[in-house]
Each structure stands twice: as C-alpha cells, then as structure tokens.
Regions:
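Conserved class I S-adenosyl-L-methionine
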Residues: 20-28
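Class I SAM-dependent methyltransferase SAM/SAH-binding core
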Residues: 31-77
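Conserved alpha-helix/loop element of class I SAM-dependent methyltransferases that forms part
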Residues: 2-20
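Short gly/ser/thr-rich secondary-structure transition/capping motifs
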Residues: 2-6, 26, 70
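Conserved acidic residues
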Residues: 20, 41, 84
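A short beta-strand submotif of the Rossmann-like class I SAM-dependent methyltransferase core
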Residues: 88-91
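A short acidic, Gly/Pro-enriched loop at the edge of an enzyme's catalytic core
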Residues: 76-86
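A short, aliphatic-rich alpha-helical micro-motif
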Residues: 16-17, 37, 80
Length: 92
C-alpha cells in the first residue's frame, strides 16, 4: 500500500533501524512490523488486541519467525529485553 510505504520512508529518514532491535507498540495486524523487518535485526510488535496479534502471527512469513515476534500487551512495563528503537504509530 502506498501510504504504508510513504510512512516507512518517513521513518527511515528519521530513524535508522538497520541491524537494530525494534519495539513496535500498537503493531495491529503487523503491516508496519513486516516493513520494519526488511532492515531491522529483530522486531517485537505488541498490541492490546488479541485478534490483531493473532492476524499478525498468521501473516508472518516462515522466514521471519525468529526475527519477528508478536505479543499481546494491555499495559507496558519495563521491557525484558533491550531495544535500540521504539516506534508508536497509528495507535492514538
């Protein structure tokens, strides 16, 4: 989708995710998560909606299983892992 690619290009101008560990808050169905994964070393997408996370997991290509993970999260506490970049879009 053109708008998704436009947003990704804008994010790339502001933040370099190449080879980095990315936390995406409010990942929804993973459409941006998969775009970030083109460059990132690892992406964790979290969303409070179980149905969205389920869809994201279904859409994930087998080749991304180790580098892209999805979790249901109603609240956000301290992360268990370190991330280089945290992104939050389309979630307000």
């Amino acid at each position: 989708m053109y708008v998704d690619r436009l947003e990704l290009d804008t994010v790339r101008e502001l933040v370099d995710v190449t080879g980095k560990r990315v936390l995406e808050m409010g990942c929804g169905d993973g459409r941006f998560t998969f775009l970030y994964a083109e460059d990132a070393a690892y992406v964790l997408g979290i969303d409070p909606k179980r149905v969205e996370v389920r869809e994201a997991r279904r859409a994930r290509a087998a080749s991304l299983t180790k580098r892209v993970k999805f979790r249901v999260a109603k609240t956000i506490g301290p992360p268990r892992r370190r991330f280089d970049v945290a992104l939050f879009s389309w979630s307000l």
